[in-house]
A protein has these predicted regions:
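Cytoplasmic-side transmembrane-helix entry/capping segments in multi-pass membrane proteins
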Residues: 10-13, 71-80, 126-138, 186-195, ...
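Juxtamembrane helix-entry segments on the extracytoplasmic side of multipass membrane proteins
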Residues: 5-10, 37-46, 68-74, 131, ...
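Helix-helix packing/entry segments at the starts of transmembrane helices
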Residues: 13, 17, 46-47, 84, ...
Length: 309
């Protein structure tokens, strides 16, 4: 039975990572490009949070979940700013400019940045080797961005969309860290649900206010529903359940598949070509993440697993 649970947990982890990976091409499908815009980044951000918030409210009521205690509101509020607003908004603006494959390379730094932010916010000491991996991964992203800027005719320099993607990674990382502070008390699934519900007073009226007046392609609405239901909600249930059943240490390694799944998903969904340079840089960044995660683990195992999105 234990082996079956571990196997099921691993597959649930892979399923959760797959849901998160498809977020990038689906977001670009929803927002469109600068030449052919669809849903506005603001509407997409507030709309996906509102959709997930309604589903979360139903779940919390159905399970008779108690209200968070007073000390838990601040971490949940910070998670709202990072995960419900900051990350999706910055990502949506960036994906109007760059391809989903391009964004997959930049956001591959998320697990490494999360560990670095945890060391800073929680005042944890990290080994020198970890910081060297963080620097190496960051340099790879900078070089990739510079190369891509040149091929796009932007000359030698970073595109502003790359800055937005880096800021999105930091926003998500801080949101994960603050959410993790209340996870032991509330439970992982309830944390993401409370984050979505807390955003409702802003996300729901904002969605209605910003509802598009112009005609929008059906594919954009498909992207909207996907990021609201699967990226923002269902994916976390699969991911956290997988961590619980299969073991956080084993299942968390499946998130290393995320940038490659994003790149592969962008081929049929957006018609983006498979690029050897992009795949190569993604693999190199993932390698720094693997090394960094090993070096960030404490000498005496008592680690906290953080989900990536």
């Amino acid at each position: 039975m234990k082996i079956k649970d571990e196997t099921l947990g691993m597959w649930l982890g892979v399923l959760g990572v797959a849901f998160f990976a498809v977020t990038l091409p689906m977001t670009r499908l929803a927002t469109g490009t600068q030449a052919a815009p669809q849903l506005s980044p603001w509407f997409l951000t507030l709309g996906r949070a509102a959709l997930a918030g309604v589903l979360s409210a139903i779940f919390l009521l159905a399970t008779r979940s108690p209200l968070p205690k007073r000390p838990q509101w601040k971490p949940l509020g910070m998670a709202v700013l990072g995960n419900a607003i900051g990350f999706p908004l910055l990502l949506a603006f960036a994906l109007r400019v760059v391809s989903a494959s391009h964004a997959a390379v930049i956001t591959a730094l998320l697990p490494l940045v999360t560990a670095a932010c945890a060391a800073w916010v929680l005042h944890q000491r990290a080994r020198l080797g970890f910081w060297l991996c963080a620097i190496a991964g960051s340099l790879l992203v900078v070089v990739f961005s510079l190369l891509r800027a040149g091929t796009h005719g932007g000359g030698f320099g970073l595109e502003w969309a790359d800055v937005l993607l880096v800021c999105a990674v930091f926003a998500a990382s801080l949101g994960y860290i603050y959410g993790a502070q209340v996870t032991p008390a509330l439970g992982a699934e309830r944390v993401i649900c409370w984050v979505c519900v807390l955003a409702l007073p802003v996300s729901l009226p904002g969605t209605l206010w910003l509802w598009p007046q112009q005609s929008v392609a059906a594919s954009a609405w498909v992207g909207f529903v996907y990021v609201g239901v699967f990226s923002m909600w269902v994916g976390f249930f699969a991911w956290y359940r997988g961590l619980a059943m299969g073991g956080a240490l084993r299942v968390s390694q499946t998130q290393l598949l995320q940038p490659f799944l994003s790149i592969l998903a962008a081929v049929p969904l957006l018609g983006e070509p498979l690029d050897i340079v992009t795949l190569g840089f993604a693999a190199a960044v993932v390698a720094t993440v693997v090394a960094g995660k090993k070096l960030s683990q404490p000498r005496h195992p008592a680690a906290l697993a953080t989900a990536s999105r």
